[in-house]
Amino acid sequence: MGEITIRARIPKELEGSEGVLKTENSWEELEAEMHEDVFGHLYRAF
């Protein structure tokens, strides 16, 4: 699987390499993580 680069706005104090984060996960893994993150937090909120 190729490299995925995500660009995000990051506060100056947290900025690493020009706000570029790299992951070696596949899109499926990344999507599952984001889904789990977002919906996990939502479920805990109720």
Swiss-Prot record:
Name this protein carries in UniProt: Uncharacterized protein AF_2344
Lineage, broadest ranks: Archaea, Methanobacteriati, Methanobacteriota, Archaeoglobi, Archaeoglobales
Organism, as annotated: Archaeoglobus fulgidus (strain ATCC 49558 / DSM 4304 / JCM 9628 / NBRC 100126 / VC-16)
